Amino acid sequence: MARKLSVILILTFALSVTNPLHELKAAAFPQTTEKISPNWESGINVDLAISTRQYHLQQLFYRYGENNSLSVEGFRKLLQNIGIDKIKRIHIHHDHDHHSDHEHHSDHERHSDHEHHSEHEHHSDHDHHSHHNHAASGKNKRKALCPDHDSDSSGKDPRNSQGKGAHRPEHASGRRNVKDSVSASEVTSTVYNTVSEGTHFLETIETPRPGKLFPKDVSSSTPPSVTSKSRVSRLAGRKTNESVSEPRKGFMYSRNTNENPQECFNASKLLTSHGMGIQVPLNATEFNYLCPAIINQIDARSCLIHTSEKKAEIPPKTYSLQIAWVGGFIAISIISFLSLLGVILVPLMNRVFFKFLLSFLVALAVGTLSGDAFLHLLPHSHASHHHSHSHEEPAMEMKRGPLFSHLSSQNIEESAYFDSTWKGLTALGGLYFMFLVEHVLTLIKQFKDKKKKNQKKPENDDDVEIKKQLSKYESQLSTNEEKVDTDDRTEGYLRADSQEPSHFDSQQPAVLEEEEVMIAHAHPQEVYNEYVPRGCKNKCHSHFHDTLGQSDDLIHHHHDYHHILHHHHHQNHHPHSHSQRYSREELKDAGVATLAWMVIMGDGLHNFSDGLAIGAAFTEGLSSGLSTSVAVFCHELPHELGDFAVLLKAGMTVKQAVLYNALSAMLAYLGMATGIFIGHYAENVSMWIFALTAGLFMYVALVDMVPEMLHNDASDHGCSRWGYFFLQNAGMLLGFGIMLLISIFEHKIVFRINF
């Protein structure tokens, strides 16, 4: 970096020394430039280049000069400020290879930001620039290095092609060996001599003499080029003219330059501001126009933003706060309303269609919850690049200009964000792969067991006859015990049914199974004769038939059957594990008030955590809140269905169940408000909320819902397990796809909203 700066300064002031009289003549006769400019090389606006260069020179002279001239002391201050007054020893432990790819950045501000990254907290950033000022070791060496600096963008001009090939390796090796070859005193004295010469010619411009670095005949060799070079002498030759003093009073040359920093130009902006085409190769003469602008930007630090300035210039979050409140309120309202509408599905709970629907909804919830955790919540909790991008972008644009924000900020942020997105998608791929493996292995095992069972044939006619007799005996036994069972249930277990609403009549077969589980625990031996036919009358008849003849294993068979019945009861009546597992008798004894309190507290705490996640997500941005809201909605629907089933079995009416669920949903609004306040007013707390929410989502998805998907009771209803398998895969992949689309187009959603 110091090598470039040395070349820029030497070339600028050396060229200004070689032809001062011609510049005075050009200033006295401005019509000369107008006549020659049409003959200038196509693609370059000479007038604009001259005026822009004049502006930057006046900025430098106003900053360091007095009476329209630059003294030795002022020039020394300029060199010290940009960090090339002498060689300084610093210890920075980082890889220097990044200096060899300047063309990758293609703009001054990114390289300048990287060079000054370690000095943002103090004002001694000259040391860092001096790390690269080893190019100032000799005068002859400086002459060839100015076009070499621009070899990245030109590469076609013969004057520039000399140093193009060796630019990067020599630049890197020169930094390593400079301490052995050049002493600090030599470079300091050389720069001081250059300062003395340049300043002397500026002050005594009436009697110019050529500098040591350039020949005398430069001014007479190419008149068109020389006429177009309005360098420092144009400013110095007008000491008595008001053309210099008037701009100093204007808004461009006010003393408030530091308060209103200049725009940070990249390579394209520098060329266009000087009237040069982006595709036009630069030679040394044309590059001379750019030198004052480059030096002015380095000196004014237009491309640096200090930490204190960032915090001071960040605009208030009024816009994002409004979006957070509106979006969070709408999201919570939609989720609560649609979840309450799930009560219309309660009458369908005993139908096969409901099993398919619930299986798909659970799989969709798994996909959205895990997708939101891996693709959105965890990436945002690990890195705050999106958070800083959304809030710091106005300040960055004020400081650096819209072109820089579009070219650098967008590309870097998108590449970093997509990297975390693909890693999260890889984690989801591992999760889905293990789900497929476990599910497919289970299906294969069940298929083999079914095949072995079908292959078992009766060996002789005696076995067939025995089975027929056992079947007759079973039917007679069930008929005889039916009366006793009716009397017992009338006196005991069904006494509470007379007090229930009529809408529970359709659920009595399911309740009988619950009661039989309780009976089996209390009296395993006494009620065995009535327990078997009643429980196995419809669903477990074949299992009982296969083992009933084995009189030696009756007790063992009883325990096996009890396990199967209890497992079937759990799967049949609690398709989603959010709902509490209570028998009907327990629900009745508990009372409506106690159960309502349990639902409000248990389900309300869950809704509060969901609202907290939604509120914090909307403070991050609209797309963040959208993805979290979709994930919450997809797992709230089956969750609310389970809660409705529990409340209705407790004896509540539909209106009461809706009311208590609505009360628990109110806690979601409280959680949303808490999340918005924390995310907006607390520093970086929303990142911790995202991490906590990701853990909650993954627990609900992987611990609660995935086991329900793996252990479904499709075969008990005569349904194909493969049909369930494909339906569950469709739900999971749909959830993954929704979260992936939101994650990929998240930055575009924010961009459109901002405009």
UniProtKB/Swiss-Prot annotation:
Alphabetized InterPro entries for the sequence: ZIP, ZIP_Transporter
Ranges in coiled-coil conformation: 464-480
Compositionally skewed regions (Basic residues) per UniProt: 129-144
Catalytic activity: Zn(2+)(in) = Zn(2+)(out)
Subcellular location: Cell membrane; Cell projection, Lamellipodium membrane; Membrane raft; Apical cell membrane
TM stretches of this protein: 326-346, 356-376, 424-444, 658-678, 687-707, 725-745
GO biological processes: epithelial to mesenchymal transition; intracellular monoatomic cation homeostasis; intracellular zinc ion homeostasis; lymphocyte activation; T cell receptor signaling pathway; zinc ion import across plasma membrane; zinc ion transmembrane transport
Protein's name according to its UniProt entry: Zinc transporter ZIP6
Higher taxonomy: Eukaryota, Metazoa, Chordata, Craniata, Vertebrata
